[in-house]
Amino acid sequence: MRACELHAVIVPWKPSRPAHNCVPTSTLTSVIEVTLVPWGSGDRPLLEKLLGDPAMTEHLGGPETAEQIAARQRRYEQMNPDTGRVFKVVDDDSGEAAGSVLYWEREWRGQQVWEIGWSVLPAFQGRGIAGAATAKAIDAARADGGHRFLHAFPSVANGPSNALCRKLGFALVEERDFEYPKGHFMRCNDWRLDLFG
């Protein structure tokens, strides 16, 4: 393992003995493993799949143009680790790139906070990869220090992302209008996680 990689392993709970109305143990034995790799110059094709596809950007105001994706790729490659980090999510099972997770510094309600976002390709959705990757990114943000709070702003219509926030321990602050991308407003939930709590 290279020093710059982060691994996540989620092992679901497995009862030691059968209990009334429990899910059979055999359905709870899968292990989800992902590796977070710092974003690099060769990751633009993944970015095109994540942000150039209307289905992938349904809750983000629609796909980005080729020029917007190229500019984003440059920003990702040049991001200062003191102000945020961008990771390619690799599914350890297949060795394939499954998506991205990133966090960055922003001002929110008069204070500096981290904001986090994630995206997983359709072929890898519904398998726990987003949860494993986001949990690892949260650990990285906590280790980086700097800010107490981490916020996520999924669209109120994005059920899976809102469920993931709840599962990872974020507290729902409020529902509000949010501008993303610039010039496009949508109704979002403001989820907050206390990294020092």
Model-derived regions, located:
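Acyl-donor (CoA/ACP) binding surface of acyl/acetyltransferases
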Residues: 3-45, 49-52, 86-197
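Helix-loop element at the rim of GNAT/NAT acetyltransferase active sites that forms part
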Residues: 49-63
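Generic structural signal for secondary-structure transition and capping sites
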Residues: 55-56, 78-82, 146
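A short, aromatic/hydrophobic, helix- or strand-capping loop or linear motif
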Residues: 59-64, 83-90
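Active-site rim helix/loop that mediates acceptor-substrate recognition in acyltransferases
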Residues: 65-83
